[in-house]
């Protein structure tokens, strides 16, 4: 073969391996978002955020709040998709300290924190939005021809 017709070798595929599983957690049917605060893992379970120790899997905290989908952590606060808004939560007190509108008007499906911004995925619209965490303003949008449920 000539160099014009040869293809680069594809990397060998390995089967996925489950390294660790957590749960089940009491009174929890599903998990809709997960983030790590440097010490604990936080899981959004519909009506509350559950914190657990990643080494043992033991729950360490529970914050009652609406949590429909994605969860993110900025180094100080938790951010939680809750219906048509994003709540900024103080993890020590569980209090919502601010709220901004969610870009998908209730159709948001995942969230992450990176580059000083929130990144919000919209599964149905196949978009990921970079959001200003103080104002909720969409800074940019990435469109995809594939599912974009979680930007993490």
Where are these regions (language model features)?
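A short helix->beta-strand "capping" segment at the edge of beta-propeller domains
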Residues: 7-28
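Beta-rich, blade/repeat-based domains predominating
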Residues: 25-38, 65-75, 103-115, 145-152
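A structural motif specific to WD40 beta-propellers
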Residues: 58-60, 97-98, 139-140
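Tandem repeat domain/solenoid detector
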Residues: 76, 95, 116, 134-137
């Amino acid at each position: 073969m000539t160099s014009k017709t040869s293809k680069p070798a594809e990397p060998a595929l390995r089967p996925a391996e489950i390294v660790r599983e957590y749960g089940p957690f009491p009174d929890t049917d599903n998990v809709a978002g997960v983030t790590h605060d440097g010490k604990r893992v936080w899981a959004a379970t519909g009506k509350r955020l559950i914190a657990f120790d990643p080494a043992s899997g033991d729950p360490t905290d529970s914050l009652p709040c609406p949590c429909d989908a994605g969860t993110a952590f900025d180094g100080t606060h938790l951010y939680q998709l809750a219906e048509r808004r994003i709540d900024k939560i103080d993890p020590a007190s569980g209090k919502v300290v601010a709220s901004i509108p969610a870009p998908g008007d209730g159709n948001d499906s995942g969230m992450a924190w990176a580059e000083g911004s929130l990144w919000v995925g919209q599964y149905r619209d196949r978009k990921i939005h970079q959001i200003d965490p103080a104002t909720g303003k969409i800074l940019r949008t990435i469109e995809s021809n594939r599912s974009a449920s979680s930007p993490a």
